Amino acid sequence: MPYATARSGDVMSSAAPPCCTSLLGLSLSMFVAPGTLTAAPLDAPVVNAPAPTPPTPDLAYPELFQAVQRGELFDDQKHFVDFLPLRDPALINADYLAQHDHPGFDLRKFVDANFEESPPVQTDAIRQDTALREHIDLLWPKLVRSQNHVPPHSSLLALPHPYVVPGGRFREVYYWDSYFTMLGLVKSGETTLSRQMLDNFAYLIDTYGHIPNGNRTYYLSRSQPPFFSYMVELQAGVEGEAVYQRYLPQLQKEYAYWMQGSDDLQPGQAARHVVRLADGSVLNRYWDERDTPRPEAWLHDTRTAAEVTDRPAAEVYRDLRAGAESGWDYTSRWLADGQNLRTIRTTAILPIDLNSLLYHLERTLALACAQPGAECTRDYAALAQQRKQAIDAHLWNTAGYYADYDWQTRTLSNQVTAAALYPLFAGLASDDHAKRTASTVRKTLLRPGGLATTAVKTGQQWDEPNGWAPLQWVAVDGLRRYGEDALARTIGERFLAQVQALFAREHKLVEKYGLETDAAGGGGGEYALQDGFGWTNGVTLMLLNLYPGKDTKAAPAKRVRKPEAAAR
């Protein structure tokens, strides 16, 4: 498996990354004991060695895997990788190789005989006479999973505590989704479940050295937008500021993962998630340890790479994987020509949202280190200030908004996207920059159904005309932090009306919404529209409490010192 393909300027190790080493035959009994949150040394300089895991499906039974995915045996490429092998995958693959050329061989029957299917999450059994808030409260139990042990050869990773899945095809927990889900759990009074989800993420950090995209073997080679510090902040709002010190070891490991390799970079070089610019400042990008097709989207990726003639397929695969790590899979933000997926160059982009989240992580670490008894040798407040200065220098467009920066071509994007509001959400924007960004967003991205993701139509799901619950909340919360209450209310109420209209018609909440007046679910992407839906449920509850209707009673929020307050 190739791991060392890199763009010009990337500094790569010749060794296979530890999270992706193939360890055939190892079972989940070799996991760290569920429920144990190991106390890592403070200011751990390197990421801990990850726990051994079974190989991903594309490595465990490669020939069978490719036959199923290439043959489009299932409409959704993710479906097969979630199947449970009923015996040793190597034996299944050997039997496939011995039988597949025989006359009358039936691939579907072979799969059915050797795998157990994982059904989608069902949420349609809820009463049809419920109001929106009650419906969400009834949804939570249907979205809860408890998997502190999984069968051998499963692609699922065990977690010590119950957790909430998004719904539909998403039968596992997802990193950045979960923050917005946890907001709703707290509003619903499900504070124990919210705490358990936080502890699961701390466990993942302790076990694998980072929080993977989701709790599947095929997600271990990457992470997702780093919201762990926001989860800790949310829990501090429930329990008090001692929470910051409790999760300090995991916050430090999370930071070490995202910053790994930064100390050794020369100007103009990149390694993993970090890039050192010509002026010496360090900013981050999205990345994936592997440069092969994603198992859960194998055919999509191979077809995309086949369209590219001017660079290696491995480079395309890594950029597709990095795009998946971004959460925005996919969007014009990552496309060189702004339209075609084959021009994807995610690893060349320094995203404004990612760097805002890491600023919040640095501020949270500074706050945790200030707690009585904490011992920290790094000045995280200074690191946050350095990042803020780098963002202002490289990610601020003087036309009046924050944008992404291409570190290879040294060009700042002129595209206005919903990500421009992340610096407000993280509390790093100056008052002037916040005001100008709000004005630009109002003119460019405001739609009848809320905040548009971008103003570009590409057919990708993270572009016009779709609206996503997490981006609505980032916008509303960020704008309110800077006194832009009117625009925040407009965005929040418009999106809430869209959610309510679709709910009134179909009695469900969905993953994404079209923002025109017909109150439809969103389109585009590699799979059908999903309902459930974790982060929409959470954001809807937050908006209902901010902008209550006739049957909604808003409870006053408990105030906690936030890590960005010292930086304003």
UniProtKB/Swiss-Prot annotation:
Q: Which InterPro entries match?
A: 6-hairpin_glycosidase_sf (IPR008928), 6hp_glycosidase-like_sf (IPR012341), Glyco_hydro_37 (IPR001661), Glyco_hydro_37_CS (IPR018232), Trehalase_periplasmic (IPR023720)
Q: Name one GO molecular function term.
A: alpha,alpha-trehalase activity
Please give the chief subcellular localization of this protein: periplasm
Q: Which reaction does this chain catalyze?
A: alpha,alpha-trehalose + H2O = alpha-D-glucose + beta-D-glucose
Q: Which Pfam families match?
A: Trehalase
Binding residue positions for substrate: R169, W176, D177, N213, R222, S223, Q224, R294, P295, E296, G327, E526
Question: Can you tell me which family this protein belongs to?
Answer: Belongs to the glycosyl hydrolase 37 family.
For this UniProt entry, which residues form the secretion signal?
1-39
Provide the function of this protein: Provides the cells with the ability to utilize trehalose at high osmolarity by splitting it into glucose molecules that can subsequently be taken up by the phosphotransferase-mediated uptake system.
Print the keywords alphabetically: Glycosidase, Hydrolase, Periplasm, Signal
Look up the EC number in the record and give it: 3.2.1.28
The coiled-coil regions, if any, are none
The active site of this protein is located at D329, E511
Q: What gene is this protein a product of?
A: treA
Q: Name the species this protein comes from.
A: Xanthomonas axonopodis pv. citri (strain 306)
In its UniProt record, which GO terms are filed under biological process?
A: cellular hyperosmotic response; trehalose catabolic process
Where in the cell? Answer: Periplasm
Q: What is this protein called?
A: Periplasmic trehalase
One GO cellular component assignment for this chain's record is: periplasmic space
Q: Which SUPFAM superfamilies match?
A: Six-hairpin glycosidases
Carries keyword RNA-binding? no
